[in-house]
Amino acid sequence: MYAHIARARFQPEHSDDVIQVARDSIDAYRELAGFVRVTHLYDRASGWGFALSTWQTEADAKAAVMPLASVTDRFAPYWAEHPSSEPGFFDVIGALPTFEVVAES
């Protein structure tokens, strides 16, 4: 399995909106080939959010990036700072590589 990690900082006063977008995005992930799971993590106080998506193959993980760009766009109104990564990714520091999942419980 392989995983993508995305992180972004949102406006804390829009926490409820950010959480709703995350919840609404689940179906978009489920429609994609090789999808295993997605976990959205969020800290209401700081506005930091993380998404960890897991995919069957590295090719599946990489192929999911552009189809999920619409999910990224739905988060945009709530960013505290505009992500500085390549299209299809959202990350305030830079796009992270696709990781191989080497242990899980």
What is the role of each PLM region?
Residues M1-G49, Q56-S70, P77-S105:
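Short S/T/G/P-rich N-terminal loop/turn motif that feeds into the first structured element of a domain
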